[in-house]
Amino acid sequence: MKVNVAVSVAVVFLLTSLLPAEAQQTSKATPRIGFISSNGAPGSPSALFDAFRQGLRDFDYVDDKNIVIVHRYAEGRLDRMPGIVNELVQQKIDVIVAVNNVVIRAAKEATKTIPIVMVSSIDPVAAGYVESFAKPGGNLTGLAHLGRDLSAKRVELLKVLLPKMSRIAILWDTSGPGPTVAFKEYEAAARGFKLELQSLEVRGPHPDFPRAFQAAKTEPLDALVVVANPLMGEHAKQVLEIATKKRLATMTEASRYVEEGGLISYGPNSADLYRRAAEYVVDILKGAKPGDLPVKLPSKFELFVNLKTAQRLGLVIPQHVLVQADKVIK
């Protein structure tokens, strides 16, 4: 009898070992990835979300097949962010993907154990998110950019477009650590180019942009740098309309502002960041600890120029700038 039992167990073990790997995995819990967007709405198309999913597919992780992506939207209502993050934490999600500083901060406050992957963060060390780039520590890692060089490059580009530029304004949201770090970087860049800088400040969730522009000094401004974040993104159309009426050349890091009427943008290629964020998720699902995965910098950058806006402002964009541009809106 004992021999028969032993033989039966051996046969079951043999048959199980011969099953395809995919069939064996069905007994395991399917990994669940929480993806949180500060803007957008359920069902709305998102090229960046598609880039993230493609990044996962490149490693054979397919949504609704061997992973589940739980996508949540704040729909521009940033005050909802803590509640959205806490909902995913309560669901015991396996990884949280935080697309920007607003989501990163909410996720970091909500959990010390669930891995968090940053898609884009202004200097995470200065913001207090990680201990260092090489050894983040804790439960957070991902992609970030050191804005000092990028801020200087943006101011330099404005100087190329406006050789006589002497005064610039920085429009920024004072309610978050990311824009605060960025503003300090632009202060340093302005000093480097011997420019006078005017701070135009707003604060979420109900920013008063007309008042912010009225707070500018009586001397005319030459250009406006918009520090991109979810609050600015939500009100981009209003901001750009005011800037254009005041005949201000606008610069920002995000190409979407140029597509909505801004003059020029220079910054990391967003789709590439989302694809690379997927690589972090894959590493974590395979057992890596986020605190041991170094924070990486962008490797691809893009320059967008809006010729229609330039014409409205009476500006002529130099040919060498147009040749370098990844996209020119005519």
Go through the PLM ranges and name each one:
Residues 1-330:
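Short hydrophobic alpha-helices and adjacent helix-cap/hinge residues
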